Each structure stands twice: as C-alpha cells, then as structure tokens.
Amino acid sequence: MKRTSGCSRPIRRPATLAVGFAALAVLAACSSGGSSSPGGGATANSATANGGGAVPGQTVPTANLPVLQKVGKGEGQLNLIAWEGYLDPKWVKPFEQQTGCQVNAKYAGSSDEMVSLMKNGGGGQYDMVSSSGDADLRILYAGDAHPVNIKLIPSWKDFFPAFQSPAFNTINGVHYGVSLQWGPNVLMYNTKDFKTAPSSWDVIYDSKYKGQVTVPDNPIQIADAAVYLKKHKPSLGITDPYELTQPQFQAAVSLLASQKPLIEKYWSLASQEIFDFKNGNAILGAGWPYQVSTLKAANFPIGTTIPAEGATGWADTWMLAAKAPHPNCSYLWMQYISTPKVQAQQAVTYGETPDNKLACAEMDKLQAGSCAEYHANAPQSYFDAISLWKTPLATCDDGKNNCVPYAQWVSAWNTQVK
C-alpha cells in the first residue's frame, strides 16, 4: 500500500470551502432518519438525525448518474482519501492480495481537507473518501459523489438498520456510499496525572493545565464547546450543538478563545496527538479512540472517558467519488470493508463501533470483551450522550433561518479561536 501523508499541510483553508456554500446556506432542516438499534437496543437517534439528508428545494447534482450493474475485474489501483488509521495493513494487504487492487492512501487531517480533495468529483484522481457527517452534505450537494448500487454490497443486509440507508449518505433513496464505523470524540488523560477519570470537560478549560492540553484543529470543535455550554450555561438555550444562534455561537467561540493559552497543540493528524502524549507535552486532550488504542498498545498510561456533559462523535461513510477512475476496485473495497471480519478488525484497531451487527462476535474472537469495550452492544444511555457530527446550516431544525452556517464556523475558528 502506498500512502501520502497530509502531515505538512495546514488545515486552514476557508477558501477551499466555497464549493456548495451557496446551496448550503439555504439548506433546510435535516431529515430524522431511522430509529433502529445499532447496539443493545439503542435507537441511535443522533446517528441518523444529525447526519444530514434530503433537503426541500435542493437536489444532488449527480443523483441521476447510472450506477454499476455488475462488479468487473479490478483496475489494479484504488486511490483512497482516509482518516489516519483507517487503512491499516492488517486489512489492506489481504484486500490487495485478493483483488489485485493496490491501495494508494491519502490521509486527510480534517473533514475540510476531505471536502477540498473531493472537489470536482475527486478530480479524476481519487476513488473514495471516508467522510464524516460534517462533510457529507458539502460533498453531496457540490456534486462530488457518485450514486452507489447497494445491491452489489452483500454484507449491507447485515448492517444495523439505522446504518443501512442513513440520512448522512442516502438522499431520496439514492445511496452515495456505504456506512463504515462510528464513535465518540473522547477526553483523554494521563493516568499518572489523574488517578481517577475527570468527570467533566472542565479540565480542558482549567488554567491549571496551561500548555498541557491538545484539541483537534477543526472548526467543528465549536460544537464541543457548545456541548459543554449546554450543560453549564443553560440560559443560552442550546438544544443542538450544530444549530447555534449567533449568541450561542459567540459564547462557544469565546470559550474556545479563552482556552487558547492552555493549548500545547491544535492537532491535525492523530499521530501528532499521540506524539505529544508520549513525549509528556500533553496530559489532557480531546481525541479519538484510535489515539487511545495506539497509546495503550505502546503501554502508555492513557485513560479515556465521556464526561457528564456528553460528547460529539462521528459516523463515517466510504463515499464514491463522482469521477472515480477505478470503479470496480471501489466496489470490491466496499464489499470487503463491509464484511464482519474486516469491520471487527477496524473496530478493535481503531477503537470504534462497527455498523455490521455480525461484527460483534468477530470482535470478541480478536480481543475478548472488545464488543462491549467498544460499545457495539451498549445501552441507549450511551448513544444519547453523543451528538454526531453534521454540517452546520443557516436554517435551523425549527425552520428558522437564524442559525450560524459552517462558513462562519471556519472564519471564527481561524480568526477568533486560533
């Protein structure tokens, strides 16, 4: 597998986000999606409602493109835009051997970078992207994704219903990819410095830890501040951390601006946060289960928790580029990555939750107790605590046009927070 790192690229690109913003500014409320269980009886309301969906008065430009009717021989190459850790040799190498499709990885440090790389349908260079809910609508309504024939993905029928045709990758019955995994953005801490898990996100705003905190270099971090303020400043009236009025938005931005002196690094790649913990530069951080799993594998004293305020999270999709140069290899990848064994491998390695309900047993074969550890059979209360990423739009869920759109999130992050 060949890979291209995004380590040297700054993630400050408001100019690249212009594609689709004219439409996104007037997008209406997201659809509610399904209510079927992803785990032990949970409904995953946020997994469906918070992802996006069909928007009145708007159409996906590529909706009528013909889909593949039969998967042919692979073209020999597959160019993937992915989150770091999503293309581990443990499952990529067997895929390459089975299909003859060599995987070429381009790691992105943020959803904004993924949107930029997918511009013009992937530019005839990229085949697929492992997009999250805060990128999906931008990619779809910019016309950069291609419809997918889900009938060609045999394991799709074994997905939890909430992730078969979710609002974040399926518009008016048309699929633009296949659901992958989902999980929370967690509070990480060095267990030598914290003998018990912090019960609140307070710690990452506490001046006591000046210069010892890491957080993602991502405008969607404003939603994390909103989750915190929803609990600690109820007078703001925040109900959805991605649907903020101007006063709510400014309160979240001000909180993050006051946090700046505490920050050791705004990380753009998971490996940067791992490095800072390993080298003692950070003792607290907002991160992904992947960082936690990697640090634990290195016997580093890392702990993780979802504090009382709750957390944000993601639900990812392997989305097909509108101008994918290797469609057969792309479908072969979707078939492969959706199987219980491979979903289990990624879940255990990355520390996230699979969408294939048969993966739970495979997870426990790989690592005893991992199905429960990574919440594949968690109770409803666990899912209720997580607000999954979605694209902030000007039109709020109640139909009022007084929410702050994502373009302003990007501007505030780059000019007021950092």
Where are these regions (language model features)?
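A bilobed periplasmic-binding-protein/Venus flytrap-type ligand-binding module shared by bacterial periplasmic
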Residues: 186-193, 228-229, 314-326, 345-349
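Early extracytoplasmic/lumenal segment of secretory-pathway proteins
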Residues: 49-139
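Bacterial lipoprotein signal-peptidase II cleavage site
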Residues: 30-42
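Extracytoplasmic ligand-binding site segments that recognize negatively charged/polar headgroups
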Residues: 81-82, 86-88, 113, 125, ...
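Periplasmic-binding protein-like
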Residues: 254-259, 298-322
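Conserved C-terminal helix/tail region of periplasmic/extracytoplasmic solute-binding proteins
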Residues: 383-418
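C-terminal motif of bacterial Sec signal peptides marking the signal peptidase cleavage site
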Residues: 25-29
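Mature extracytoplasmic/periplasmic domains
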Residues: 321-387
